[in-house]
A protein has these predicted regions:
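Short, Lys/Arg-enriched N-terminal segments with co-localized hydrophobic residues
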Residues: 1-6
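Active-site histidine-anchored catalytic micro-motif
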Residues: 7-234, 238-303
Length: 303
């Protein structure tokens, strides 16, 4: 946006902690909170831009389903070619990585900037980072430093980082922090809101067309998701399952030695179920990873 033009943004409010209030001992969504967010932002930074605001649904993000994500994708995509310089989506932290990835793959990397903004606490809490995260998103759009989907987030005792939506990793248990894969965030702001690109970040141009979202269902009945753990009990498989998404240990490994594991992967193959493992980076050279081909396990790329 040039200096003589007024930036125009679209705010899409969806709920989450950033749109919630502490009622007694519980956090619950508050339909008036989106406007409280903008009011608090205005008090601290001023609003020198035009904006529209819509609210397709209000939900704590842990309750999101495929249908919720589909509704958000439809809402965002229907506004990409309007007169906005950027879109800001407020969202809960619990499923932030799912929604940012979904939007990233649906929209691609060649649209107006779409920034997701969350808060670790309700915005009136003294430790809340929601206003700072919003400041990062607005400043990022104002500077015109990227296209596609991003997440603006400030970890405790850190600066605001801008993450590519498809690179964000889930927050660890008991933590308010978010990171990108290999900690290669897109860029960062200093305390004066000057932006610096991360020299270690790299990405290719889109090799495929954006993914369709119209077939996202309430539940993913065809996909079975598993996480590796010691003494793992493998579930029974049925004909409804078409894909298995298996999370690996941190070094990209999973049990490939036990008879139980071998029998499970063999049964999946015989049923025509494709098995994909996440977290196994290219070049991982453990003995167990060498058996992936024998067990018909395919490694997914990082993003």
């Amino acid at each position: 946006t040039s200096r003589c033009e007024i930036m125009k943004l679209l705010f899409i409010f969806t709920g989450g902690t950033i749109g919630s209030t502490l009622n007694g001992e519980y956090i619950s969504t508050d339909s008036s909170k989106p406007y409280k967010l903008l009011d608090e932002y205005n008090k601290k930074y001023g609003i020198d831009f035009e904006y529209d605001a819509i609210q397709p649904y209000t939900e704590l993000s842990e309750n999101n389903t495929g249908s919720t994500i589909r509704a958000l994708c439809e809402c965002v995509c229907s506004n990409l070619t309007k007169e906005y310089d950027g879109i800001i989506v407020t969202h809960g932290t619990d499923t932030l990585q799912y929604t940012s990835a979904a939007l990233g793959y649906v929209i691609g990397n060649d649209s107006i900037p779409v920034c997701l903004v969350s808060s670790n606490y309700p915005i009136e809490h003294p430790k809340a980072n929601g206003i700072e995260n919003l400041r990062g998103a607005i400043r990022f759009i104002e500077l015109g430093n990227g296209r596609g989907v991003f997440v603006s987030y400030k970890n405790p005792d850190d600066t605001i980082k801008i993450h590519r939506g498809t690179r964000l990793i889930a927050s660890q248990a008991y933590s308010d922090s978010f990171y990108s894969i290999y900690d290669t965030y897109y860029g960062s702001f200093d305390d004066k809101y000057n932006f610096t690109f991360n020299p270690d970040f790299s990405e290719s141009t889109d090799q495929a067309t954006p993914l369709p979202y119209s077939k996202l269902n309430e539940r993913s009945n065809e996909i079975l998701r598993l996480e590796s753990y010691v003494g793992m009990a493998y579930p029974e498989l049925n004909a409804d399952t078409r894909y298995i998404l298996l999370g690996s240990y941190h070094s990209g490994t999973t049990d490939t030695k036990s008879d139980t594991a071998k029998e499970f992967f063999k049964r999946a193959y015989n049923l025509g179920i494709k098995v994909y493992i996440t977290g196994a980076s290219r070049g991982a050279d453990y003995e167990s990873t060498k058996l992936f081909d024998d067990l018909h396990i395919s490694s997914l790329p990082e993003a």
